[in-house]
Amino acid sequence: MTGSITLRGFGWRPLGRRAPVVAGLDLRVEPGERVLLAGPSGAGKSTVLRAVAGVLATAGDGDLLGEVETEGRIGLLLQNPGDAVVAERIGRDVAFGLENARVAPDAMWPRVRAALEAVRLPYGVQHPTAALSGGELQRAALAGVLASRADVLLLDEPTSMLDDANAEGVRRCITDVVAESGATLVVVEHRLAPWLDHVDRVVVLGRDGEVVADTDPATFAATMRDDLASAGVWMPGVSAPEPVEPPAALVVPHRRPAPTLEAVALSVDLRRTDMRGTVVAAALREVDATLAPDAVTVLGGPSGAGKSTLLATLGGLQRPTAGEVRGLGMPPHRMRSRALAAVVGWVPQNPEHGFLTTRVRDEVAATSRPVGVDVDVDAVLAHLGLDRLADANPYRLSGGEQRRLALGAALAHRPSVLLLDEPTVGQDRGTWAAVAGWMRAAAHGGAVVAAASHDSALVSCADHVVRLADGRNAVPAPRVEEAR
């Protein structure tokens, strides 16, 4: 029946892994059902979505067991929306699926524009995809899925990189589309509360990929709160856990004292060139920011405000158009890679783009060797909950596991400056506490710690907040108000 999903004894073991990510999973989703799929980091939620979409075993990189049946046209939003970008311009990217479905141009482009408007993306169809922020890429990818008018919508953390206002708008857009079309919806999220009023059913996977809860939202919220919160699930009404700090020896900067890093009247233009010509986008305009040692600073603001660009410029990965970065003795973009890496640890928004090896253990040590710092790899992996994956391939981890690995790899050599782009995306309660604890312990040890984030729980742990809007400094709000 169109829109139905059936898994019988489904299992998946990635190539090179001894244990399966998911084993013996039985699940039936009826046509038109709206299902919230939850569970701790690494439980196999994304694996299930990819299996249902039929894209899990296409590269022959694992063993698939059991049966998976999906009836109807499928729209899949990947956990990392950048993985789905196929065109240089937003319009062509959103239209890609429609072109493959042979939708006539006179019908296709109105659907493309309507989808972009629905996801609140404020750009025309000619805007370059390379100039989009992570949150904007997420909305562009969702627009492509919604424009397809699929019978089954599979959405992997569709709001994880969005500010609260845009996240609410996207949820409303999704539920409106589902209500109008009658499509089946399976959405994966870690932060469950905003979705409970929009779904019929909540399915929770355990750490071994087994179903530990399958019920309606009201029963889920009323009877399972404490048990599932202790298992790592972000339950409604349960406050964020206390950060768990690693031993000081893992995080205290190997070079002290750490510098105060300053952005002074910083402006950045992003230039993108394709066959149509060069497009210049103003990413930052005269931004001032001070990142002090012994403190955690969060860069806040809506999607597309310039947070990632500011981090990249502070870390020497982006050359400023005007203004300067002070504190490292010379402009960071002019420093040699080894000298910069010894001082600055940077975790990008898409962590898998920076992996250098094919084994988790080796990845943690990869940066430390060139800069001459000994690292207790086992202790780093244990704190980040990756010890059982020490011999796994980094590219076959879950999104949350990849993000923690990137953090361990970038920070294990104890740099003086930590620049983290959305470090808590894809984390359950336990792994969130480990990431937040690493940040806080590094700051207590004298490091400069800065993170771009929409996570209000992380903001509540910050000592300072720098807010951006439209590439400029916004009026800063008190930290307590930010946390709300």
Stretches found by the model and what they are:
Residues L142, V170, L407-G408:
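Hydrophobic anchor residue at the start of the ABC signature
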Residues D208-V233, R472-R484:
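Conserved beta-strand-loop-alpha-helix hinge in the C-terminal portion
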Residues A107-G124, G372-L389:
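Conserved ABC ATPase "signature" region
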Residues D61-I74, G323-P331, L340:
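Conserved ABC transporter NBD signature motif
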Residues L153-E157, L418-E422:
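Catalytic Walker B motif of ABC-type/P-loop ATPase nucleotide-binding domains
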Residues A53, G315:
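Helix-to-loop junction immediately C-terminal to a conserved catalytic motif
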Residues V145-L146, A410-L411:
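ABC ATPase C-loop
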Residues P128-L132, E136, N393-L397, E401:
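Conserved ABC ATPase signature
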